[in-house]
Amino acid sequence: MNEHQLLCFLTVSRTLNFSAAARELYCTQPALSYQIRSLEKELDAALFRRTTTQVALTEAGRALLPHAEDLYRGILNARTAVSYTHLRAHETCA
């Protein structure tokens, strides 16, 4: 599971639409589907129930959602902390 897969999962979970999520992520729908399929394969669970007209989270998808949100938020917070530390180091060395 990687950061990009988490972002793809979270975006599809929010939009419940692969085409809309792909547009939002500036990628193609097949590329987005590949990321979701890879995540599903790694977790050995279907995360979305797909029909020709609807997308819905499965029970596994609903179970993953709060953890994916926490993980992604943690990644963003870690980046911010490192960036802040890096900026502070440059200020004190000047």
Go through each PLM region and give its residues.
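Short alpha-helical "packing" element that flanks the helix-turn-helix/winged-helix DNA-binding module
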Residues: C8-F9, L64
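Single conserved hydrophobic/aromatic residue that forms the stacking wall/gate
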Residues: H86-A89, C93-A94
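Alpha-helical linker/hinge and terminal dimerization helices associated
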Residues: E42-L43, L64-Y84
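A short LG(V/I)-centered, amphipathic sequence patch enriched
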Residues: E40-L57
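Short helix-boundary/capping micro-motifs
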Residues: V12-C27
